[in-house]
């Protein structure tokens, strides 16, 4: 087929070449009564120039019973023929015809509101695995270890509450398993904390000379006993802790006690033996708490006689060797949303499929026409009296369950941070640009919102879309 090298002749030229006695045959290009290439044709209506927008509504009352009884706000059907006299069944037989001589596009804008909590099984933020002591002999020496899956209840928690729930999950696992097989309380294996245990450390005595660890929060931390480990391979809770892999695309994320070189917690000065009148004498480490729980001082030959066998990720990262845990992980700002990702919009009956996609009835394989961040945002505020509020809650809200070992300087409840984070669902208004539209748009449209794993999201509360059709170009050129 050959195409003309010049534009078609003008109307006057055509009229001059045809005798006036004959009815001239004017090419369709010159017909203006049908609005030409901008025409939009509805069923049973003549072609007309139309500025009607296409509204994608997730909760039309007429659509619910007929179309969406088994759907939700992230995967629904909606009628786009704006006629109150049509039932959804009648609208499904209608269509909107965009002039075939033009290529059409639609400016797509969306409004999305979600009510997602920050700890859910759906987002892999309510559980993690830990390698903890399982059995011990009569003297308390640990014999075997096992992998346990620790789970916390789903909910929307602040940073302080989430830390308490993580530690409570460890304690409940110990009560259900380790305690039943002679494992001692000081060998619980795993603790989440927020303190910097190196503050007050004297390099000469190699002890924390104040006799207590500074009760101030700095950054979420992981404390492990010898032989223990924590696994975040299938969990997002490491994002809440502000601990990420330095190479995030590599498979697996396990932090072992052996990885935390240089992270041994220094022992406290035993204040009962120390005499301030003779500061150079009687400088000995505190070996156990008032309930005879051992601090395991001097049990790690690689650390020295004044260090406990507990190892802290925060200490290993900041004070350990460069080729240690710092080469594998990176300290980042804690994310109370546990690292939510993106969502995808799909309009399979309206937008032209990319050549690499094929039509499907499976929402996980619909062509993607728009993407945006999931609208769950962290909010931070400063509370200088957070530790005071925490102590006040112990007597008013009866939160003693979060402080099972108050006599132990390491296993006690971690102090609340002064910078508190909460998660908030913020409605998002997004402009997705121009989408290529099909020339034949069915009266009932499928609208799907999927997460990063291409799953429909049950936490979508409101999803709206507006598409404004317009001509992009002519199909003849």
Curated annotation (Swiss-Prot):
Compartments (UniProt record): Virion; Host nucleus
Q: Name one GO molecular function term.
A: structural molecule activity
Keyword Flavoprotein tagged: no
GO biological process terms, semicolon-separated: endocytosis involved in viral entry into host cell; virion attachment to host cell
Induction info reads:
Expressed in the late phase of the viral replicative cycle.
Alphabetized, the UniProt keywords read:
Capsid protein, Host nucleus, Host-virus interaction, Late protein, T=25 icosahedral capsid protein, Viral attachment to host cell, Viral penetration into host cytoplasm, Virion, Virus endocytosis by host, Virus entry into host cell
An annotated GO cellular component: T=25 icosahedral viral capsid
**One Pfam family cited in the UniProt record for this chain:** Adeno_Penton_B
Binding partners and assembly: Interacts with the fiber protein (via N-terminal tail region). Interacts with the capsid vertex protein; this interaction binds the penton base to neighboring peripentonal hexons.
Q: Can you tell me which family this protein belongs to? A: Belongs to the adenoviridae penton family.
Q: Fill in the misc note.
A: All late proteins expressed from the major late promoter are produced by alternative splicing and alternative polyadenylation of the same gene giving rise to non-overlapping ORFs. A leader sequence is present in the N-terminus of all these mRNAs and is recognized by the viral shutoff protein to provide expression although conventional translation via ribosome scanning from the cap has been shut off in the host cell.
Q: What does this protein do?
A: Major capsid protein that self-associates to form penton base pentamers, each in the shape of a pentagon, situated at the 12 vertices of the pseudo T=25 capsid. Involved in virus secondary attachment to host cell after initial attachment by the fiber protein, and in endocytosis of virions. As the virus enters the host cell, penton proteins are shed concomitant with virion acidification in the endosome.
Name recorded for this polypeptide = Penton protein
- Species assigned in the record: Canine adenovirus serotype 1 (strain RI261) (CAdV-1)
